[in-house]
Amino acid sequence: MGQKVNPIGLRLGINRNWESRWFPTKANMAENIGEDYKIRTFLKRKLYYAGISQILVERTAKKLRVTVVAARPGIIIGKKGSDVDVLRKELQNLIGKEVNINIKEERKAGASAQLAAESVATQLEKRIAFRRAMKKVIQGAQKAGAKGIKVSVSGRLGGAEMARTEWYLEGRVPLHTLRAKIDYGFAEAHTTYGNIGIKVWIFKGEVLQKGVQPEKTEESAPAKKPRRARRGK
């Protein structure tokens, strides 16, 4: 099951938090979902070259707060924050509500699965060999401290007549382990031969609750030697 399902959705509430944080009612649930989709689509298209790894949407009774995590926040902020004000006005015109925008820097861009997938897509669109692009992303993730990475590309690779799927795996990526912190990203490369899909899984380590120790089984515990009976004097 872990090989098929989205690893982020499988771990929500375990070691991953929701990217849309609000409590809906039946009356406004569809409206809020539509607004979140518009916000994410708009920001992804407008700020693509800023390297966006995550977009968080939080709602209160009257306000809406959007947090953008980007590898190059300077492109979004601009000189003295002028570009942020323009972006805020565009979002307010898009959804018709007051919006607050926070910009955060992605400190370990190499360990972000979404940025890695977009990097491979950009290289494929520039006609770089897919194997070279995949290995470059894997090396960047390893330098950033990732414990494992898997990259999969699918489509007409190298302009071949028949579509196929190829993947590389370095380290370990335990998709079945729920306590494993795994980041997942997907992107598409639009080439002259058609679209190529890129999927990236990055394993960042296991997360255990504080104070919880793994149970010791009888096999793992060292065997105790039987005590010798004492002889009476």
From Swiss-Prot:
Residues 39-107 form the KH type-2 domain. Residues 213-222 have a biased composition (Basic and acidic residues). Signal peptide: none annotated. SMART domains: KH. One of its GO terms (biological process) is translation. PANTHER family: 30S/40S RIBOSOMAL PROTEIN S3, SMALL RIBOSOMAL SUBUNIT PROTEIN US3C. InterPro entries: KH_dom, KH_dom-like_a/b, KH_dom_type_2, KH_sf_prok-type, Ribosomal_S3_C_sf, Ribosomal_uS3_bac-typ, Ribosomal_uS3_C, Ribosomal_uS3_CS. Residues 211-233 are annotated as: Disordered. Residues 224-233 have a biased composition (Basic residues). Part of the 30S ribosomal subunit. Forms a tight complex with proteins S10 and S14. This is Small ribosomal subunit protein uS3. GO terms for cellular component: cytosolic small ribosomal subunit. Gene3D superfamilies: 3.30.300.20, Ribosomal protein S3, C-terminal domain.
